[in-house]
Amino acid sequence: VVRVNLIGSFNVLSRAAGAMAATEPLDEDGQRGAVVNMASAAAFDGQIGQASYSASKGGIVGMTLPIARDLAAVGVRVNTIAPGLIDTPIYGEGEQSDAFKAHLGQSVLFPKRLGSSEELAFMVMDLLTNPYMNGEVVRVDGGIRMPPK
């Protein structure tokens, strides 16, 4: 889990940043690109049995600011999103899946539902297009704080 989630994210970011750094600046500030990493609410609220997953996502959170500082010299911004419960195919389909998702949604502060992939994509777009957003971790989770189990 750590190899794929953390080391894989670091390796992809390193390659992408190297390619971005080799390009001409996109604007008068000297920006050459932006990276948005994906962590998880588990980085902050890991549940029982999730130690390696939480550590892998916590590592992504932890590397965000130092890498943003490193890449500032070449005009590359770095931010991270820590999604909560997002409605994806991982939950399956059908009546039983819908009931499970509704149950999970009740643990969200507001709105009492799972987030949508579109809502997550909106945040990705915000982080990519706002030139003053750098070195930040943004939770897109409806205010949920996961219980231990």
Protein language model features and the residues they cover:
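Catalytic Tyr-X3-Lys loop
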Residues: V1-N11, V36, I60
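Active-site helix of classical SDR
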Residues: L13, S56, T64
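Alpha-helical segment proximal to the catalytic Tyr-Lys
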Residues: G18, R69-D70
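Residue(s) in the substrate-gating loop at a strand-loop-helix junction
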Residues: S40
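Active-site loop immediately N-terminal to the catalytic Tyr-X3-Lys motif
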Residues: D45-A51, V74, K112
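Short, small/polar-rich loop/turn modules that mediate ligand/substrate recognition or access, typified
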Residues: A72, R77, N134-E136
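Catalytic Tyr-x(3-8)-Lys segment
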Residues: D98-E118
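C-terminal substrate-recognition "lid" of short-chain dehydrogenase/reductases
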Residues: S116-V140, R145
